[in-house]
Amino acid sequence: MGGIVCTLAFKFVNLRGFRHSARVIRGDYSSHAHPGEASPFQALSTAVSGTVGLGSIGGVAVAVSLGGPGATLWMMLAGFLGMSLKFAEVTLSVKYRRVRADGTVTGGAMYYVPEALGRVGLPRLGKFLAGFFCVAAIGGSVTIFQVSQAFAQVHEVTDFNQKFLFGLLVAVWVGIVLFGGVKRIVKWTDKLSPFMCLLYVVACIVVLAVNYANILPALATIVREAFAPHAVSGGVIGALIMGFRRAAFANEAGIGSAPMAHATVRTNEPMSQGFAALMEPFLDTIIICLLTALVIVVSGVNQTSSNVGIALTSDAFATVVPWFPAVLAIVAVLFALSTVLAWGYYGEQAWMWLFSESQRSRVAFRLFLCSMLSIAATFPLDQVVNIVDACSFCMALPNILAIYLLMPELRADLASYWQRVVLKAAPEKQNVA
C-alpha cells in the first residue's frame, strides 16, 4: 500500500526519474565540498549490499516454494512500487540527517519519525516510535537469514558441517571491518557489490542458456499462476502475499534500513540521493529476483525437489553441471558478508541513537553483534524467516507512518527539484546535488 500511495503521490517518479537516477549515481551532480562521507555510488553500494543479499536467492526460492511461480510476478510488482517508497524514505533520511562535529554523518528513520510526529503535535509518540524502530533495527542487524543460508549452501557443496565455526568466522571478519568505521565499510561494499551481482547474473544467464527452450514456457507459467485460482498456498491471494512478503525482505523498501546508508552521501541536495535510491528495488527485485525465479522454474526443480530456500536454487544450478552449485556457494558467501556488513552499520546507528555515541557504546554493540552472528547458522529456516518478517514489520510501521505525514513536504520538494535540476539543461557537471 505504501508503494502504491508513493507512486501516485509522486506521479510515477519510479518511471520518469529513472534516467536522472543513473546520472546521479554516475556522479554528475556530486561535489567533494558538500557534507557527507561517501559518493552517491558508494552510498548506493552500501545500501545495495544490504538489499541484494540472500533474500534475492534464498528468499525468492522460499516464495516460489510456498507461493508457486506466480509469486514472482507479485514480487516484481512490489519492486516497481517499492522504487517510489525507497525514493521517499531516502530523501527524508538525507534531509533530516545529523552532521557531527568531526564531520561524520548519521541519519535514518529515527531522525525523521520524531520530526513527522512533532508536526502533528505528538512529539512524545514520535520519540517512542523512533525508539521502537531502533530496537527492531538492532534485532534485524543480526541478519540470521544471511548467515544461515550461506552456511546451507557451503554445506551443500563441501559437506562442511561446523555451524558454530562458520558463524564465528563470519563474526570475526565482520568485526574487523566494523571496527574500521563507515569508511572501511564503503571501501569493501563498493567493490563487493558490483562484483557479486555480476557474478550471480552471469551464473544465472548460464543456467538460462542451458535451459533456453524452457524460458518462454516459464514466463507463461509465472503469469498464469499469478492469477490462477488453483495456485499453491491459496491461489492468487497466497501467491500475492508470499510475493510481497519476500519482496519486502529482498529490497527493504519502506523498512527504513537503507536510508541509514544513503544518509552518508556527500550532497547538499537530499532529493538527488532519493533518485539514486530508485535503482535499488529495480536491481534487486526486478532483475536479480526475476533471474532467480526463472532459473528455478526453467530447470523444473520447483516441481521435482523437496528443498526450500537456497538449497532449491542450488538444485537449479546443478542442472547445468554437477560442480555449478560451487559458484552459488561463492556468491552466497559474498552476499552474506556484504549484507551483514551493511546491516551491522544500520544496527550500530540505531544502537547509538538509543544509548550513546561514545566509543564504549560502539564497542558494546559490535561485540553483541559478533556474538550473535557466531550462533546465527544454528537457527532453522522457518524460525529465521519468521524473525526476519517480524523485525521488518516493526521497522516499517513507524517509517511508513512518517512518510505519509511528511508527504506534502516531499511533493513540494520534488516539484522544486524537478524544475531546478532535472529540467535544467546542463550537459556538464553541476554542483547542485
Locate predicted features.
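Transmembrane-helix boundary/entry motifs in multi-pass membrane transporters
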Residues: 24-44, 79, 90, 94-140, ...
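Extracellular/periplasmic helix-exit of transmembrane alpha-helices
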Residues: 89-101, 204-221, 234, 263-267, ...
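Transmembrane alpha-helical segments of multi-pass small-molecule transport proteins
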Residues: 1, 75-76, 126-134, 156-180, ...
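Membrane-interface loop-to-helix entry segments
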Residues: 1-22, 137, 149-154, 161-211, ...
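Transmembrane helix-loop junctions in multi-pass membrane proteins
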Residues: 9-14, 56-60, 141-153, 174-187, ...
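Alpha-helical membrane segments and immediately flanking helix-loop junctions
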Residues: 33-66, 92-95, 101-116, 132-135, ...
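N-terminal alpha-helical transmembrane segments of multi-pass membrane transport
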Residues: 1-54, 64-71, 82, 404-433
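Extracellular loop-to-transmembrane helix junctions
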Residues: 1-20, 65-104, 284-289, 324, ...
